Amino acid sequence: MVKGKYEGFSASGAKDLVFSAWVEVGNWNEVLRRLMDLKFALQADRDKIPGVLSDLNMESPFTRFKRFSDGEEYALLIKEANIAIAQIQAASAFKRRADEKNAVSGLLTQSAQQPTSSIQGSSQATVVRPPRESDSAFAEDNFSFGKFDDASTAFHKARSYLRGLRLVALDQEDFEEKFKLVWKETPQQQQNVTGPTVPATSSGGGKGPGVA
């Protein structure tokens, strides 16, 4: 990498954007494509979200002493985009407690004594009944579904926002023109590694050069 620095960097607006989130266009499109393929209702897909987001590189492509990347396009992420990414990350942490316990949502089984009659005798049977609101399992399931709806809504809204986001891509030329920056390379010092010249003498003890 050629050493140098941007002249006038402190007075430019670029100085305030060094610590902002930037994305390389190709990397952004790939991560967004993978997010669009995920089905939030599936726990296996929710578990993939952190890994997908971790592949998104949001480092700045420039500093005062690092020239804007050449041959690539980058875009600055606005505040709302960063919030949407954080919402997707938070939603991915959702897990249904009922699912983790291998429970069946909304159904409880119990053994009940069927009434006897003159035609059918007394027998033991398993009856599936709708849960009552007083059932602790039902209350837990309602609470779990409520959180799932919130998490699912947050995920889909945030993902749709990112998909519809129109990023402004900049390459090196665009960036330097926009912020009126000039890159100045650091001069390379040429070191003299040659030693002093020693007069040569002829073999056999003859007179050296310059001797009359």
Swiss-Prot record:
Domain of life: Viruses
Keyword Iron-sulfur: no
InterPro entries named in the record: TMV-like_coat, TMV-like_coat_sf
Compositionally biased region (Polar residues): 109-126, 186-202
Alphabetized Pfam families for the sequence: TMV_coat (PF00721)
Gene3D superfamilies membership: Tobacco mosaic virus-like, coat protein (1.20.120.70)
Compartment(s) of residence: Virion
UniProt protein name: Coat protein
Organism: Pea early browning virus
Native organism taxonomy: Viruses, Riboviria, Orthornavirae, Kitrinoviricota, Alsuviricetes
